[in-house]
């Protein structure tokens, strides 16, 4: 869990139910890349909603996965230690384990199923990695672009078939 993530009371149940339907890495903030640049993406889950399970390229804020899959996070050295662990995990799990990444349903009318119910309130202070004074937004997104491009170069298959 990110430090700004408070899940709904049925988030874990939602993840378990989703695992029965589509086994994979689960998370509350799903990202579907449209391009080799991270900023060009669509969202599923927080802060938007999705009525059905959605396959995504990476997830953040609250991961849910089988313990055995943690081995994939360190299978390769990540391109940076400052940023991008979310995409590195999804890329590595896909490459070495054939594991996909999903965002469980986040229906508008059932917030207790959501993976983050206070993200807007808790995730906008100067302590947030994407907002802090040590890392500019430009540097943060440049690093994320680099992470996307490194994974693509190494064979990451994105939902929309993004290429370098």
Predicted regions: what is each one?
Residues 1-3:
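Active-site acidic Asp-centered loop
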Residues 5-78:
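Conserved catalytic core of nucleotide-sugar-dependent glycosyltransferases
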Residues 72-164:
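C-terminal catalytic/acceptor-binding lobe
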